[in-house]
Amino acid sequence: MSDTTLFRTPVETPRTCHPIQPQDGCILLGSCFAQEMGNYMNAYEMDVLCNPTGTLYNPASISLLIHHALRNTAEEDLPVFTNNGKWYCWLAGTQLSGNSKEEITIMMKEKLSLLKAALQHASHLFITLGTNICYRLKEDNSVVTNCHKMPANIFTESALSVEECTDTLLTMTNELLSWNPHLGITLTVSPYRYAKYGFHKNQIAKATLLLAVEEVCHTRSEVSYFPAYEILLDELRDYRFYAEDMLHPSPTAVAYIWQRFCQSYMSEQTRQYLREYEQILKGLTHRPSHPDSPQHKAFIANLETKREELRRKYGLQK
């Protein structure tokens, strides 16, 4: 046994046939783990859109948002509501709120238009599924993305079956590919553990999602799977790689999975761009002793020049 595998069992992460080029547009939707990967891509100034309406957790919520984005029109009514003087939308997280129905509607339509345009031109879409638990409004049985701390008695909670998850994801995939036939879709299951449902129920949820994703990938060759869940649970496999809450992956684990993600989905040219940009990031995040000194200002100006040269070199837009 080699030294590199002595204390771990490596999870295979096959290389994609359609790797991300430096100038490619990418979309990340789903749980907080999607946000973690999106944060890395944003830090390297890649063309990425991540959860424009907030965090999403289950296949039904993600599919519903995509459907509304692709069918977004000025005339379409959105599921908005008011609480304590503020207006919210059942398709979005709590960070999107307005002082009137008109304001929240305009905000949501702008976000949906942003997502629609991105889906039309993006080369890659990454969807991270967190759970199969779904919440619906009792009054009309409609799916909600976020409960917005509203009374529990206005919702019903249900666990989507493997068949329901599969059908939902396949319908979503068909709709996406009819809109953008060149879109590469990657599904992954979040390694975050949903303790609020109990660990047994969490495992059932993850198993349900994994079985559904397997069926979708088998049915549609355009869809691939990235094993973030397996990397944390089967390869890293240690509480050292969890945050203080023992539920979220630690920054070290996220960084490791990011590296594995890059190996699988980034082209050699993109990985070279990331390596070169890393040097600029180190300079930009350096804490100087005298930030107002002429020397430091010249240092920052030089970094900005290198940054612009690097972006032009790899064909990245501003």
Each model region followed by its residue ranges:
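Extracellular glycan-modifying ectodomains
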Residues: 1-318
